[in-house]
């Protein structure tokens, strides 16, 4: 063995065990009769040996680099990681994200109070605003009265909260009757009946409404002002009505470039799902948008700066099945199907979170309390994707801002519940009504479960959004609502992905939106 090889062996051994040297290395550099050398002398000797080592580099040119073996051990190189080209998707000052959903977070949970406090708080919060709207709409000579001050046949204005009396509405009494063997009601798509009545309530008393008001177009929980008179039967004959005035949203200025957010809902994954291919097409279209032939779709998908999932990640039947088989999962080493579904969703979100921000809202089927406002899903349900800062678990409803654009949305429970109790023609019209009524979910807590708030009502819409959406709807619908004072609000019904295989792309510059189908490998815009 040459001297160089001996020296290299000594160097390698030294850097593997700093401050020590092997017996063979010591004998190679000193006589056997030499005493044991101190550590400092060994370090000095090895440094001299490194300097004396012959260089394999040619004489001319810059000084030779340190030997590879020593350099590798001293400063090991970290493995390189492939990074997706996401520079164009990074939010700018024009698209900075602000979460405004703090009012939906439950910090102190107390379920020992009555739900009447929520209605009283809603009426108390909106009374002055609705009264002002009534004064602006009608002649100020018409008196605004409390119900106990009404004089029969004298025209006046009343302000109160609406209650819809429905004979077919589900109730706990009917549930108990069903459990005791009484006949069930036939399945219904709606609980509307010709005998339904509208009743206006306030702190003093209540009064039945009739006249120019369509019972089937209203639901419980709406604060409104009505103009009319009381007849000889004690029924208030309505001549006109109004709601709170919409606040004027911030004026939007044009952006330099078009930026988009992608809205999706209703994956409904389970062990029998058949949409895994479509979800894979969705991920591939987002991560490899440069391969898309359509320039229009390529421009949209390459400029997605946010992906919002409006609930219902898993199928509802899984939860029912697991409830009956709970003992089996506790006693045997078996995995619930919903766990496998959540694992698949986590892998999906992990890929998307690598290229853009993703906002996850819970839905009625998801592992979160069904009562509104639903709290954020726990990050432990997404062990991979939750490690990325671009993954955000949020509430339902979800209120947020991107740049100057205010967006407000739900996972669809509010729209579904209103559809059950009215004959409103389409879902986007329900969204428009909620906007005019000034309440996200007016039927909370009558027929839609919610937390029993006492001192505030978080469902009141104090600030008019620029975009108002609802997830898990039967089909894609959109409308540009135009109100007084040049107010414009984009209303969006997001289709259920498991049924439509499509998402909605919203242009933040123009507030226009497109339904994009991912039914096959080539995404298409549905006209």
Regions found by a protein language model. Give the residues of each.
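Extended recognition/assembly regions associated with phosphoester-bond processing machinery
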Residues: 2-527
């Amino acid at each position: 063995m040459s001297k160089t090889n001996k020296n290299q062996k000594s160097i390698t051994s030294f850097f593997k065990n700093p401050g020590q040297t092997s017996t063979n290395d010591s004998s190679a550099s000193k006589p056997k009769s030499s005493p044991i050398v101190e550590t400092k002398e060994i370090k000095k000797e090895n440094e001299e040996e490194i300097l004396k080592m012959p260089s394999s580099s040619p004489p001319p040119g810059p000084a030779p680099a340190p030997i590879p073996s020593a350099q590798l051990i001293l400063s090991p190189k970290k493995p390189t990681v492939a990074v997706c080209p996401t520079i164009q998707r990074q939010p700018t000052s024009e698209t900075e994200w602000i979460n405004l959903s703090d009012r939906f977070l439950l910090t102190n949970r107390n379920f020992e109070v009555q739900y009447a406090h929520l209605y009283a708080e809603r009426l108390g919060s909106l009374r002055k605003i609705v009264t002002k709207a009534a004064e602006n709409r009608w002649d100020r000579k018409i008196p605004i009265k409390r119900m106990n001050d009404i004089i029969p046949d004298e025209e006046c204005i009343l302000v109160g909260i609406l209650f819809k009396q429905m004979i077919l509405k589900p109730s706990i009494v009917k549930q108990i009757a069903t459990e005791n063997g009484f006949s069930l009601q036939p399945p219904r798509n709606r609980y509307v009946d010709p005998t339904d009545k509208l009743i206006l309530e306030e702190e003093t008393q209540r009064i039945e409404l009739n006249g120019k008001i369509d019972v089937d177009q209203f639901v419980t929980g709406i604060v409104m002002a009505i103009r009319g008179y009381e007849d000889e039967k004690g029924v208030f004959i309505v001549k006109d009505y109004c709601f709170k005035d919409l606040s004027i949203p911030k004026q939007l200025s044009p952006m330099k470039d078009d930026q988009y957010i992608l809205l999706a809902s209703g994956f409904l994954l389970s062990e029998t799902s058949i949409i895994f291919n479509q979800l894979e097409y969705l991920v591939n279209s987002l991560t490899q948008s440069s391969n898309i032939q359509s320039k229009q779709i390529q421009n949209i998908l390459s400029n997605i700066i946010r992906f919002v999932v409006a609930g219902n990640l898993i199928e509802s039947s899984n939860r029912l099945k697991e409830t009956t088989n709970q003992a089996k999962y506790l006693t045997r080493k078996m995995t619930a199907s919903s766990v496998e579904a959540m694992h698949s969703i986590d892998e999906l979100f992990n890929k998307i979170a690598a290229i853009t921000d993703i906002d996850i809202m819970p839905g009625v089927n998801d592992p979160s309390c069904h009562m509104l406002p639903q709290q954020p899903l726990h990050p432990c349900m997404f062990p991979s994707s939750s490690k990325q800062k671009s993954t955000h678990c949020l509430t339902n409803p979800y209120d947020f801002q991107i740049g100057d654009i205010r967006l407000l949305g739900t996972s669809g429970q509010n729209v579904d519940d209103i559809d059950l109790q009215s004959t409103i023609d389409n879902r986007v019209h329900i969204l428009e009504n909620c906007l005019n009524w000034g309440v996200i979910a007016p039927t909370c807590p009558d027929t839609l479960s919610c937390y029993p708030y006492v001192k505030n009502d978080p469902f009141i819409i104090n600030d008019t959004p620029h975009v108002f959406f609802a997830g898990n709807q039967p089909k894609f619908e959109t409308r540009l609502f135009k109100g007084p004072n040049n107010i414009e609000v984009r209303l969006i019904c997001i289709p259920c992905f498991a049924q439509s295989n499509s998402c909605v792309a919203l242009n933040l510059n123009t507030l226009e939106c497109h339904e994009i189908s991912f039914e096959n490998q080539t995404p298409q815009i549905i006209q």
